[in-house]
Swiss-Prot record:
GO terms for molecular function: nucleic acid binding. It comes from Prosthecochloris aestuarii (strain DSM 271 / SK 413). InterPro entries: Restrct_endonuc-II-like, tRNA_endonuc-like_dom_sf, UPF0102_YraN-like. Belongs to the UPF0102 family. It comes from the Bacteria. This is UPF0102 protein Paes_0016.
């Protein structure tokens, strides 16, 4: 059984958040929206604030999930991160942009059960 893209994406974000928690990250916010853009996960890794984009794919037949984080998408994430920092986080802090790729390997009763995770820290930088 396959999932519709929205469900797959949501479950991929849940899997990424759980994976980050297991790695010692502290989740600050999920699905932070600014205007029409969104950051999937905002988390602390020790003393670094991480803005995490999650891309989930059922297969890699049409490309690896990391390929979907285009330069345009990076600009949108950076703009949204700046808005978050200005409006909601009023102290100086080290920041970085990460990408988590989730590739589905198995489903059970419509739920993502098996998957591969690839986490790229410092995947891109704000200029």
């Amino acid at each position: 059984m396959s999932l519709i893209p929205h469900d797959l994406g949501r479950q991929g974000e849940d899997a990424a958040a759980s994976w980050l928690l297991c790695k010692g990250y502290r989740i600050i916010r999920r699905n932070y929206r600014y205007r029409r853009n969104e950051i999937d996960i905002i988390a602390m890794d020790d003393r670094t604030l991480c803005f995490v984009e999650v891309k989930t794919r059922a297969t890699i037949d049409k490309g690896h999930p990391l390929e979907a984080v285009t330069p345009q998408k990076q600009k949108e994430i950076i703009r949204t991160a700046r808005a978050f920092l200005c409006m909601e986080y009023h102290e100086e802090i080290d920041c970085r942009f990460d990408v988590v790729a989730i590739i589905a390997k198995g489903y059970e009763k419509g739920r993502l059960k098996e998957f591969d995770v690839e986490h790229i820290t410092d995947a891109f930088w704000a200029e």
